[in-house]
Amino acid sequence: MNKIRKFFRGSGRVLAFIFAASVIWLLFDMAALRLSFSEINAGLLKEDIIRREHTGFRVEPDQVKVLYTSIRGMGLPRNGAWGKENFRKAENHELKVEENMDQVQRKGKMQNLLGRRKAVPLWHLAHLQTLPVTIPMQKTQGRDSKPEVSSQYMMSKWMTVLESEKTPFTASRGVPLTKIAGRTETFDKKQEAPQNYNVSSDTSKQASERTLNMTISVKTDRSKQKSQTVTKLRMHFASPPILKSEEVTVIKKAEAQSKDLKHEALKALPLLKFIADMGHLKNQSTNETQLGRLPEDDAAKVAPGKKLNFSESHVVIITKEEELKTDTKEVPNSKTQTVFPKLLGGSPHKQIPRNQSKTSSSPPALKKAVSQSKPTISGGLHTARSNLTAKAPTVGYQQSHANIPENPGMHHVFRIDVTLSPRDLNAPGQFGRPVVVPPEKKKEAEQRWKEGNFNVYLSDLIPVDRAIEDTRPAGCAEQLVHNDLPTTSIIMCFVDEVWSALLRSVHSVLNRSPPHLIKEILLVDDFSTKEYLKADLDKYMSQFPKVRILRLKERHGLIRARLAGAQNATGDVLTFLDSHVECNVGWLEPLLERVYLNRKKVACPVIEVINDKDMSYMTVDNFQRGVFTWPMNFGWKTIPPDVVAKNGIKETDIIRCPVMAGGLFSIDKSYFYELGTYDPGLDVWGGENMELSFKVWMCGGEIEIIPCSRVGHIFRNDNPYSFPKDRMKTVERNLVRVAEVWLDDYRELFYGHGDHLIDQGLDVGNLTQQRELRKKLKCKSFKWYLDNVFPDLKAPVVRASGVLINMALGKCVSIENITVTLEDCDGSSQLQQFNYTWVRLIKHGEWCVAPIPEKGSLTLYHCDNRNNRLKWLHKSASAFHPELVDHIVFENYQQLLCMEGNFSQKTLKLAACNPMELQQKWKFEKYYEV
């Protein structure tokens, strides 16, 4: 003790204090250095994530594009990411991140499914048929067949290309970009091989719809009674997540731990290729799984014989007493700032504020990238891991959207084609190829034609989720859309639709649409009589939580069925589709983008052709727009090549459309109700596209065709649907109703091309409400529509005008009191000005030239379009009496009578028509053509 004390005497005491102080200083310095490194790492993490946001989370060229997959046949669907059962399973797998990582380290079986492996080279869907991939043929399933879920189903739900910020690489047709050789892995008997994969998705209302969740369960030998979870992936569609400090630490730690175990874990997985666009992972990989089937005990869990409990929200019965309301007060007006792009294809790069419910979007700038919050168990973004030996539920991170910036950011249109199981590359009609009916089946095909007025036999042979070629113009994939696009309700109305055609329509929407944008799919059954569209359809669609069926208790027709769907829709945008369509890749976002930029825009896809005879998918010519000819017959008209060249119009440019086809379009729900929806006085079908088109354009809206949105449609020469009344009379009645409300003075032009419409005296119902609605909306005139929207439509108000000259005498018809006389021609005299109208009246103001057949003379009478005693044939008589083309003929008498001039007496009279009599030939000063 004395020896120690001497060190603290005198100078030794000073040295001791200096030593102690040095040690303490060193400790503080090391602590400060550690804190500094932590701050630097956090800063680098923030910069890296912000940089990725600015660069759009681009997929590098060496990263993967994937093989599309699908089911074949029409059996009950597998319980995929859209399935109800798997939607619920995510809630049962909750465990903290630390526990998950400890199990990874303990078992030594961890693998980063999206880790750093060599990527498969890019390839294109159009070249699938050239790839040497062997997939076992599947037996065509009927509506009541037992579904067989293959083992590869677990991953194939997400074998899709999510090109959020990467231009798709496309080679010339027929030239594959790469060869993908299929192989089958075999498991070691000592190794625990995965037997079953079940895909499930989180349906929590708080979960972000901007992302996609996939939970993969690996079930081992039943004797061991172990359920193992491989991974849970969160595919990001837009902005990066907010990573918390503890989460970042655990992720990086797990990556390091799994790096050495990757090779061993890979042996347990057979062949399968997929990709996910992970914002915080720099590399992507392929995972491999074996093609096979579920064991019988697992397959039985999804057998169609299982009793299904249909919720009240799945099937809604609408009775006759439930009146279809169209009160605009039901949907509040959207108080938003409307911006009209200056150019037709205006740049969508500006942020347009929108006061409506939006899909959640991750903020691009991370103000709290390193937070102290603990990780939570919810559908979030994390690295994909696999634990093949222990029951380890997946984990994620709850994103906070409290501080969403004003500019939500943009991304490239997603190229999504999600399917439930691998596609049979050799299936009939795959990739939109034509199919030929075998000779021995031609009679059966002919007999079934009447079921849908197209080749129903071939439709049933073709997979309900077949692949079709991406027919979008080059450059569409490079276009940007906003991250916070509005949600949409898909409304499909049908009556006695062909089973396979209806299923193919629904599958194409589910497979090729970003799920976070689909609020629901409403199938409105307009009182179908087919048995398979009742319980069988309910059973099939119950597999998809977002599909609801509305059943009308009596036949209402397409128009009122759509109104029923609109009333039950909850999405921000209504997207109407026919029930025999196939949506192509990238079809939805371009439509919603236009509505997002301007809520008064009605966006229509390019409607391509599904051949009714061989079911082939065919593209159409570019630069087409919807138009009409008199009397309001819809048709397609191509923009002339010289106009395209002169104005430098590109294939991707948006086209203003005077009239939409009416079957396929997206419209803001609140705006739809502001316009008064469809005219509820229209019956069944026909004319509704004209009515809504005129209403949109004349009341402040716009209709556009979006070339980057493509939807195939089965065009039929006739439809098989029954009408409560005569079909033609129903359509004509609707058109007359539209003309009386919207055409103003031009309705005579409409009647002139269908003069029988006046003669029939159709009861169009009460028009007061529709006319008052037009005044309330302060809609423009039809002349404005012709001048500004459809200027190339020839629409003269009258057929001929000016002075009426007798070709033999050179004298003109004139008015004197209430009589008609012949005078010297004076073009400046108002008494000699006449109009020959489209309803064949010779008008002078409110007076019309009227014959008195019994006396053989003429007089003036108040004009009445319905009075056949005032109608004359001129020029148009050439169809029946070509020799009387220059005569003015009165045909509503026992014999043909013609107007004849007598200059000596300055009178006009009626005489029997004589083609050789020059005094019976007349001409107006000016004629108009259409």
Swiss-Prot record:
Tissue specificity of this protein: Expressed at low level. Not expressed before E7.5 during embryogenesis. Expressed in dental mesenchyme and tongue. Accumulates in a subset of mesenchymal cells at the ventral-most portions of the 12.5 dpc maxilla and mandible underlying the dental lamina.
UniProt topology in membrane: Single-pass type II membrane protein
UniProt-listed GO biological process terms: protein glycosylation
Residues the record marks as carrying a glycan: N198, N213, N283, N287, N309, N355, N387, N568, N766, N817, N835, N902
Superkingdom, natural source: Eukaryota
Keyword DNA-binding among record annotations: no
Residues where Phosphoserine is found: S285
Binding residues for Mn(2+): D578, H580, H713
SMART domains: RICIN
Compositionally biased region (Polar residues): 193-209, 353-363
Keywords associated with the record: Disulfide bond, Glycoprotein, Glycosyltransferase, Golgi apparatus, Lectin, Manganese, Membrane, Metal-binding, Phosphoprotein, Signal-anchor, Transferase, Transmembrane, Transmembrane helix
Protein family according to the UniProt entry: Belongs to the glycosyltransferase 2 family. GalNAc-T subfamily.
Protein name per UniProt: Polypeptide N-acetylgalactosaminyltransferase 5
Protein's organism: Mus musculus
